[in-house]
Amino acid sequence: MSTVQTVLGAITPNLLGRTLTHEHVALDFEHFFRPPPADFERELQAKISMSTLGYVRMYPYSSKENVRFYDEEALEAAKKDVLLYKKHGGGSIVENSSYGLKRNLEFIVDLAKSTGVHFIAGTGHYIHAVQDASHASLTVEQMSDLYSKDIITGIQVNGETVKCGFIGEVASVYPVHEFEKHSLQAAGEIQEVLGCGVSLHPHRVTNAPFEIMRLYMEAGGRANKCVMSHLDRTIFDIDELLEFAKLGCYMQYDLFGTECSYYQLNSTINMLSDGQRIDNLMKLIEEGLVDRLLMSHDIHTKHRLTSYGGHGYHHIHMNILPRMFAKGVTIEQVEQMTVTNPANWLAFNP
C-alpha cells in the first residue's frame, strides 16, 4: 500500500489534509545576501523593525538578519506561524530544505510533535555553490546511495530514526553545473527505483525548467512524480507554460505572498502579484490541467513571517482561496490542487 513518509512515520495519503508543497521552516540563505544600496545601508544593517521593514521588503536579500532564517528568533517565529497555519485549516507542510541549505531536522521533528502538522522532509542537493567539500565531490553513485538511505533507512535525530519522504528541492543554476547534473541524474535514478516524489528548483530563466526535466527524465525519473517549482518567476507566457505542461510534471506556483516591484535575484523579472498568480492558475485549469497544479509560499526569509510583518504560512488558506472562490474557482478544483495533488505526488510504496 502506498503511504506518505512524514518525519514522525508513514501515514495514509488521506490524512495529509490541505498541504503546502514548498516551504522552509529553517534554513541558511546567507549565500544569497546582496550588498545593500549605499543610500539604504544603515537601514538594512539595522535590526528589523517597523521603521526598517519597508527597506527590507524592497531589498530582502540585503538584510543579513533577514536571510539568517535559522537563529532562535526565526525558529520561534516559524513555530508561531505553523500553529496559525494549523488553526486556519492547514494539515501538512512539505519542507524543501536540502543538502547545502543546512536543514534542521531536529526542529522539523519538534514542530511536527508540538503543532500536530504533518511534516515531510526532503533529501537531495541544492546548487553547487552552497555545498561544502564533502558533498561537492560526491559522484552520482554516492548521491544515489545517500538519497536512498535518507528515504529507506533514515537519519538519526536525537536517538530517533527520521525518514525523508521525497527528493528535493534539487536545485540548479543555468547553464546547469556538472555537480547539479549529477544530482538530477541521481534523483531520476532513485525515483525510478523507489517511486517517490521529486521537487526540482529551476534557475531564473525560461529554458531552465525544460532542461532540468530533460536531464531528470533521461536518468529514468517519471514526470508524473516530479514537481517543477517556482514557475511564477520562471515561465510567464501562457503558451510556453502549456508547452511545458506537455512534459507531464506537476506545475507549482509557490511564491504566493511575494509581491515586490524589484526582484533582487533577477532584476529583469517582473514578479507576479498574487492576483496574476490566481489568473494564471485559472487559465491552466481552463486548459484541463487542474490535476497537475500545486500552490505554496516558499517562505525562506524572516520578513515573510507574521512576527516580522509578513503573511505567514496561512496566507493561501486565509487570503488566496477566498479570492479564488470569488473569481469562480470551485471547491472541487481547490481540493484537487491543495489536497489530492499533493497526496498523489507524495504517496509511494518503498
From Swiss-Prot:
Pfam families: PTE. A divalent metal cation 1 binds at H22, H24, E169, D298. InterPro entries: AryldialkylPase_Zn-BS (IPR017947), Metal_Hydrolase (IPR032466), Phosphotriesterase (IPR001559). The keyword Protein transport does not apply. It is an enzyme of class 3 (hydrolase). GO terms for molecular function: hydrolase activity, acting on ester bonds; zinc ion binding. Binds 2 divalent metal cations per subunit. A divalent metal cation 2 binds at E169, H201, H230. It comes from the Eukaryota. Its cofactor is a divalent metal cation. Its EC number is 3.1.-.-. Keywords: Hydrolase, Metal-binding. One of its GO terms (biological process) is catabolic process. Belongs to the metallo-dependent hydrolases superfamily. Phosphotriesterase family. PANTHER family: PHOSPHOTRIESTERASE-RELATED, PHOSPHOTRIESTERASE-RELATED PROTEIN. This is Phosphotriesterase-related protein.
